[in-house]
Amino acid sequence: MLRLAVATQQETFERIRDPLAVRDIEVVPVRASERTLSLSSPDLPSVDAGLVFPSRLMEGGAVSAALDVPWVNDREAILTSRNKAEVLAALSTAGVPTPETTLVSNPVDDDSVAAAAETLQTRTDTAELVIKPNSTTRGTGVARVADPDSLLGVTDYLDLVHDFRATGDRSFLLQEYLPDARDYRAMIVDGEYAGAVKRRLPEAETAAGKWKHNVHRGAVAEGVALSEAARELAERTADVLGIDYLGVDLLETDDRLVVNETNARPTVDDATKYEPGFYDRLAALIRKTAESR
């Protein structure tokens, strides 16, 4: 039986364990962070491949070196997808539609930020913008602003957080806000569409003024059948980025369909929300990865 190291969220581990077991793949948990690890004689399981490179790059690097196996999504794939600006620039250059976005390489002065926001608002003919840290996940630190004072207030907070945590990435994005956009997460496995969910907020949450569609922020993920255009867009995104196993976030309005973000560490949802052959294709990709060793 092939043994697969999994260092992703607990919910993904629980969901993929049994379906992969019946396909002769044993899912083995590997913890890369919040632990002690002897580098001289690391206490790690014997595995044939890994699913996705651990989220903490330093600890992940040590664990990956000790395991000495290929990953379905390696460090390069994780770094590429985590850099939202790089993803959007690559997709835009390849002709893949994305929201109008400006990268702010912090620190910059208030006048420069305000000028960039005004230019973006003029180009998109919209008053509201979304501001987000370039490397954020799960909607952390993402805000919606409609006036200069609110915008600069958010950047003030970003400056404080950056200084306190001495983070390596201080950049952030200014992005057009697409009101009433439908939010989808498409799953790509080995370059092909494998299913999708629509993420929506309960009506009570929307009525209360919430707008973020992240599941970890209270949104509900429902299995949907995407249009052919949306499927092709998600597949094209994975092809441009060169990432075999990818979550592609799509926003759709009445007249636009764009790629908003990607996730090379996607949470696996219930099997009923994916195409019937999802686990067969995932197992085949894992085996192909192990054979590349």
Regions found by a protein language model. Give the residues of each.
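Conserved N-proximal alpha/beta basic substrate-recognition cap immediately N-terminal to
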Residues: R3, A7-P107
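Phosphate-binding site of ATP-dependent enzymes
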Residues: T140, V145-E232, T237
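Protein kinase-like catalytic core scaffold
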Residues: L129, A194-G195, V258-E261
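A short beta-strand motif that forms the metal-chelation/ATP-contact edge
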Residues: A186-I188, R256-D270
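ATP-dependent carboxylate-activation loops
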Residues: D269-F278
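Short glycine-rich anion-binding loops that position phosphate/pyrophosphate groups of nucleotides
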Residues: S55-L57, N134-T136, R265
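Active-site nucleotide/adenylate-binding loops and adjacent lid/helix of ATP-dependent enzymes
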Residues: T80-F172
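A long amphipathic alpha-helix within ATP-dependent nucleotide-binding catalytic cores
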Residues: A208-R256, R281, L285-R293
